């Protein structure tokens, strides 16, 4: 029921956690049937090879670089090897490689170098800002971008 609800709400891409379903391929098929692009997310303990059979079916792979649950966690550096492995497995396929968790000015350049092309930054964007100080958010985003542009 969630896939249809997200699609009806206007989602373009729906990403499901690999570990949240017994049949990831069926979930990907259901997302596509709803008219959306399909993504699959991997928790830190899930090996890259787990999604090899899905590579011709997904538009996005999200590597969780923290354990899901709450914001502000520290980046798990061992996930760089998983990012590199997935980039190699993806090859020339048009699949986004997204990183979610602990993305900040200390980690952004490393994940981009490893092969990521979509970065999800939460706490690093919103630190120090407020409704009264919204310009801080833009400054934080620029600081993250500048780490891998140089």
Give the positions of each predicted feature.
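Conserved, mostly hydrophobic/aromatic
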Residues: 6, 61, 86, 100, ...
């Amino acid at each position: 029921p969630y896939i249809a609800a997200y699609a009806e709400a206007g989602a373009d891409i729906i990403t499901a956690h690999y570990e949240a379903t017994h049949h990831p391929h069926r979930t990907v098929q259901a997302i596509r049937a709803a008219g959306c692009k399909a993504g699959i997310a991997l928790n830190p303990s899930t090996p890259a090879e787990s999604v090899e059979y899905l590579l011709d079916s997904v538009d996005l792979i999200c590597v969780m670089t923290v354990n899901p649950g709450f914001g502000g966690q520290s980046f798990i550096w061992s996930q760089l090897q998983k990012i590199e492995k997935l980039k190699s497995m993806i090859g020339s396929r048009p699949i986004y490689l997204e990183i979610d968790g602990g993305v900040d000015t200390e980690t952004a350049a490393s994940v981009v170098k490893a092969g990521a092309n979509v970065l999800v930054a939460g706490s690093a964007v919103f630190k120090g800002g407020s409704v009264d100080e919204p310009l801080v958010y833009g400054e934080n985003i620029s600081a993250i971008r500048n780490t891998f542009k140089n």
